[in-house]
Amino acid sequence: MKQQLLLLEDVDGLGRSGDIVTARPGYVRNYLMPQKKAVIAGAGTLRLQAKLKEERLLRAAEDRAESEKLAEALRDVILEFQVRVDPDNNMYGSVTISDIIDEAAKKNIILTRKNFPHSHYAIKNLGKKSVPLKLKEDVTATLFVEVSSESSYVAVLNQQPTQEEPAAEESN
């Protein structure tokens, strides 16, 4: 039998702070209660619920403003990567989410894996790509990534060795 709970914190896949939800007893007993993420819903928790919802609305407004500010800042940012390529411009490896997060951190942009809706995103071609991001409070943004070759390869044609001219002609 599922139990009704009042969430004290946001829980992925279950609900947000201040919501009354139902969950299985094992999940409640083994995870939510020991982590202090929920309390059993009862008559006395209604005041607590109102307080939590008010705090959540304030936090949501702050998070939304912060996310919109970050989305606005990301419009002008292009992360540049230089990768090794073979003579046919095929990349060795790929540019992964971890690479993008590290490069963004160098430009004082804090991103996490949660910001990428496609968890296995990898860029495997040269050129300019747009990477979709999901920020807090359902704000979306686009990050531009430009991947170019590390150095331009020059194809050197094998030329046949030229025959050396005789150094000195014999004079009689």
UniProtKB/Swiss-Prot annotation:
**Does the UniProt entry include the keyword Cytoplasm?**
no
Keywords, A to Z, come to: Ribonucleoprotein, Ribosomal protein, RNA-binding, rRNA-binding
The record's listing under InterPro entries reads: Ribosomal_bL9, Ribosomal_bL9/RNase_H1_N, Ribosomal_bL9_bac/chp, Ribosomal_bL9_C, Ribosomal_bL9_C_sf, Ribosomal_bL9_N, Ribosomal_bL9_N_sf
Annotated GO biological processes are: translation
A single GO cellular-component term from the record reads: ribonucleoprotein complex
Q: Where are the transmembrane segments?
A: none
Report a single Gene Ontology molecular function.
Answer: structural constituent of ribosome
Q: Which residues form a coiled coil?
A: none
UniProt cross-references to SUPFAM superfamilies, sorted A to Z: L9 N-domain-like (SSF55658), Ribosomal protein L9 C-domain (SSF55653)
Name the domain of life this protein comes from: Bacteria
Give the protein's function.
Answer: Binds to the 23S rRNA.
Indicate the family of this protein.
Answer: Belongs to the bacterial ribosomal protein bL9 family.
Concerning NCBIfam families, the annotation shows: L9
Query: Know the name of this protein?
Result: Large ribosomal subunit protein bL9
Originating organism? Chlamydia caviae (strain ATCC VR-813 / DSM 19441 / 03DC25 / GPIC) (Chlamydophila caviae)
